[in-house]
């Protein structure tokens, strides 16, 4: 297994990125991006392993302890981390593709579910041979990580990333708002109708300056968790064959072994499904009756402050929210979390992230050593000392991580996978950027009018998704 990359592969990968940019898959124009050169990437121009993450300089600095620990183990490998500021994952992937097109890609990229198949299809190098070679070293990792997270990074039978962190769309609730409405903690198996009744009770107790349910218009935590709970999605979900080498090698005795595959596929639109209409109609009713907001596009930057000031009753989010609520002044008993409400199923949605080795990496063997080290408990405890996300390792989701910060029922986070093993990743094919645009474009219209408008919006979404899925990734 060599780390060398020949010029032919480098040119193919560069052409791939240029094609993706030219096709508009990212939804922006090259002219609007800052010019990038080799000097923009730490490590480019020397033998350092260059690693790109989404974030700020402070995020890069936060990884220094992990880099120091890695250097002690591998003094022959120099590592430099570049944090790339971006509005969201789509923006981050845009900037990575720009670097590839400029001929100055990083060696390793931290990629979330939203971009996993885009990278696997064209940009990333599979990990199969490395994982097989170092199976003895990797066994402890897989024993500590739920197979659903691993399967999210399988693509056409090969593994492209190891999950480092993840978050499910659970339901956060403000305990003060619940108490004011005379509500107890919801049951683990509460339904979408129970949820609506809870919202109505909070609205009655707080008729003004209060939102019972706040949600955003994006792939994670928007309409998709409701679609999953209703046993559907806006894209038809199928699975690739393959992957037996991984599942039989590391998860042979796992109770969910029979569910595993060579990876998810989303090849066709499904916005015209009756259950998609039913799910949107439910959300339309919440908006119409003043129980929920019209969804805000993006991540909802004002959400933490509103929730912390007791102006929001419930919202879908994952373990990444805990530290932010703590820093906003919420006590450990001021909020709690519960499983997402049950409908026809109680399948949840999650997103995960991990490092991908670029096909153009200068030294793939060195890149693998970084990924292997980063998957260790030592490294993950250095990178995730606070509940800014949910660690992929089950053993790290423990009382110590949430002590003094909450929530009281923190076990919900990992129990989401253990109790609902069909819980699945964000629907993100290689054309994810265009697909997300097609979804977001039609959501607000679908939930803000009458039934006729809803049907028109879903018909528009179906057409937009058909076009999006035809695009070359």
Locations of regions flagged by a protein language model:
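Early extracytoplasmic/lumenal segment of secretory-pathway proteins
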Residues: 46-50, 56-115, 193
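Hinge/lid segment of periplasmic solute-binding proteins
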Residues: 113-168, 334-338, 404-405
């Amino acid at each position: 297994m060599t780390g060398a990359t020949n010029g032919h592969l480098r040119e193919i990968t560069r052409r791939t990125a240029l094609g993706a940019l030219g096709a508009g898959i990212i939804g922006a124009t090259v002219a609007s991006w800052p010019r990038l050169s080799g000097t923009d990437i730490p490590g480019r121009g020397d033998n350092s392993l260059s690693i790109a993450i989404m974030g700020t300089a402070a995020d890069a600095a936060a990884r220094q302890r992990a880099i120091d620990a890695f250097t002690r183990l591998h003094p022959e490998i120099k590592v430099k981390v570049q944090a790339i500021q971006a509005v969201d994952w789509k923006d981050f992937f845009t900037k990575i593709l720009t670097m590839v097109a400029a001929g100055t890609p990083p060696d390793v990229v931290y990629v979330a579910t939203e971009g996993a198949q885009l990278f696997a299809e064209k940009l990333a190098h599979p990990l199969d041979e490395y994982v097989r070679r170092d199976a003895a070293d990797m066994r402890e990792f897989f024993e500590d990580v739920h197979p659903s997270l691993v399967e999210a990074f399988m693509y056409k039978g090969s593994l492209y990333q190891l999950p480092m962190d993840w978050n499910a769309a659970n339901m956060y609730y403000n305990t003060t708002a619940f108490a004011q409405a005379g509500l107890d903690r919801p049951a683990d198996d509460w339904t979408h109708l129970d949820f609506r009744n809870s919202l109505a009770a909070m609205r009655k107790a707080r008729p003004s300056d209060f939102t019972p349910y706040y949600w955003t218009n994006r792939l994670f935590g928007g309409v998709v968790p409701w679609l999953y709970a209703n046993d559907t999605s806006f894209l038809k979900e199928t699975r690739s064959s393959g992957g037996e080498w991984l599942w039989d090698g590391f998860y042979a005795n796992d109770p969910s072994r029979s569910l595993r595959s060579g990876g998810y596929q989303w090849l066709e639109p499904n916005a015209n499904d009756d259950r998609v209409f039913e799910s949107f109609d439910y959300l339309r009713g919440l908006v119409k009756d003043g129980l929920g907001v019209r969804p805000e596009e993006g991540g909802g930057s004002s959400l933490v402050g509103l929730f912390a000031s007791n102006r929001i009753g419930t919202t879908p989010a994952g373990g990444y929210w805990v530290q932010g609520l703590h820093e906003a002044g919420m006590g450990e008993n001021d909020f709690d979390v519960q499983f997402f409400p049950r409908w026809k199923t109680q399948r949840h949605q999650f997103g995960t992230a991990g490092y991908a080795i670029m096909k153009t990496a200068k030294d793939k063997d060195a890149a693998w050593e970084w990924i292997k080290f980063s998957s260790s408990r030592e490294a993950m405890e250095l990178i995730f000392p606070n509940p800014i996300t949910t660690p992929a390792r089950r053993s790290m989701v423990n009382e110590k991580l949430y002590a003094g910060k909450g929530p009281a029922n923190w076990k919900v986070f990992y129990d989401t996978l253990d109790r609902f093993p069909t819980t699945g990743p964000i629907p993100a094919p290689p054309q994810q950027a265009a697909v997300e645009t097609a979804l977001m474009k039609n959501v607000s219209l679908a939930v803000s009018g009458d039934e006729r408008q809803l049907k028109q919006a879903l018909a528009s979404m179906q057409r937009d998704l058909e076009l999006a899925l035809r695009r070359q990734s």
